[in-house]
C-alpha cells in the first residue's frame, strides 16, 4: 500500500481491537466494524471542517492532503476511538501526557468534585486548597529540597519561568553579567522564544534564529555515540570534560545549564547515564551555575523513579514538570526551586519580586487532577509495578534487538526506542509519516521522530496488551520497509 495516499476510509479495515489476547482473525469474526456511507460522510465533515478552521500543531498542513486526520470522539483506558468506532491503542500516551488511561474514573471524580466548588480564581492575591496541597506534596517528593512551586499551563512556559528566575536571581546577586545559558546538542525544551533558544533541533529553531538569544551548546552524552571498542563511561567523561571547558571559560557569563535528565525525548530519545548528571551537578556547584532539570517529559515516573534526577541522587536548582503531572487531563506545568532562590526575591521592592504571571496559573481543576494522579501513584504502587511493566515492554520488543534493519535498541523505564538504519530507508524524509499511517491501519498510535521508533505507553497496559502492541509495531514496520 502507498501510505502517502492512505485515506480515512482505509481505516475500516482496522484489525487491532481492544479484545486483546485474540488473533486478528478471531477479532475480525467477533467484531469487524464496517463504515456505512452516512457515517463516512459525517467523518469527512469533521475532518474537512477541522482542516478548514484548525491550525494543527507540529504539522505541515499540506501533508494532510495525503496524510489521514482522525476525528477522535472518546477515550477509554489506553484506547482512543474515532467517530467510526475504530480503536487505536495510545502507545505514546497522547504526546507523553496520559499516565492512567483516558476517562479514568478517579481523576474524573476529582475534577467533578472540584468543579462543584470553584473552577478558577486568580492566584495573585488569592490561594485555594488544591494548589496548596499539590505544592506541599510535590515538595515532599523532593524531600524538601525544592520547596517552592511556580505554576503555568504548558511545558515551554515552565522552562521560561526557570530561565527567567535564574537570570533575575543573578541580577539580584549583583552579577548581571551571568545571563547566558548552556544546553545540550540536539536538546529540545519548547517552542516559546526563551525555550526555543535552548533548543538545538534545527527543524524547530531555524526559522526563528534571528529572534533567539545565543547560547552555548555542549556535546550530548547520547549513548548511540559510543563507538566500537569504546565505553559508555568514556563517553560520559568526554562530554563532562567538554562541558567543563565551557564552564571554565565562560562561567562568569553563564546563568544556568539546562538538561532533560536521562532522555532527550524530542531529540530522538537520546539516552544517557545517571553518572553524567552527577558530573554536571558537581560542575555547576564548582562554577556557581544553576542546574535546570527539564522533567516535563521524563518526570512523573516515566524513567522508573518519580523524578529522573533521583537516578543520579542529585537535585537541581530548578525542576520543571508538565504533561503527566495532571494525569494527562488538563494543561498544567510548574517550576520548582530552592529556598535560597526563593529568598533572593523576598524583598521590599516590588520590582525585585518575580512578577511573571499567567491567567490560569494554579488552576484549581488542573491541580485537583494532579492531586488525583499523585494519589493513584501512591495507592496503586505505580512505581513499583512499573518495574515489571518495563520488563514486559523489553520482552515484547525483543524482536527489534534481533532485526538487522534496526539499531540502537534502548530503554529507560517506560520509554523504549530503536532506530531504523538509514541504509534501508527508501524515503528517509517521509518515513515517519509512512510509519504513522501504517500504524493506524494496525490500530495503534505511534509517532516516530525521524528514523526513531519509540513507545511511551500509559502505566496501565497488561502484559498481553504490551505484547500485541509490539507485534503491531512490527507488522507496520514490515509494511513500510517492504
Locate each region found by the language model.
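Short, linear, compositionally biased motifs with a strong N-terminal bias
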Residues: 10-13, 371
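Short hydrophobic targeting helices and cationic amphipathic motifs
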Residues: 3-4, 11
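Basic polycationic patches enriched in arginine
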Residues: 15-17
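Conserved N-terminal phosphate-binding loop of PLP-dependent enzymes in the Aspartate aminotransferase
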Residues: 27, 31-482
